[in-house]
């Protein structure tokens, strides 16, 4: 099965967590299961939320999916588990983590990044305040994450 990264169809592909269209490739995540089905996320934080969803378990019933994340600087697709993450980026859903191929001072590995997101070490509160001041969130009701 071909599990190489897919091209984003900006007119069609949407995040399965928040239902927003994929608008910024440099923060996108895609998961491809052994059947070749692809699901999209517009922010690594949305991906982390989905890990606890029953639909993720269904998606990977035939085996572990290959998961790609775009390098925040270049847009190159990286293996999500091998990438390094910096905190402080302005990301589509405000989690604040951008991926990089290279580890630099202050960057986190995948497991640490997931743990930080689950602990709420994100820019979500700042993001929500900004969106509220701009007239509200644009994602589906109840789908804007934690």
Where are these regions (language model features)?
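Intrinsically disordered, low-complexity linkers and terminal regions
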Residues: 1-40, 44-146
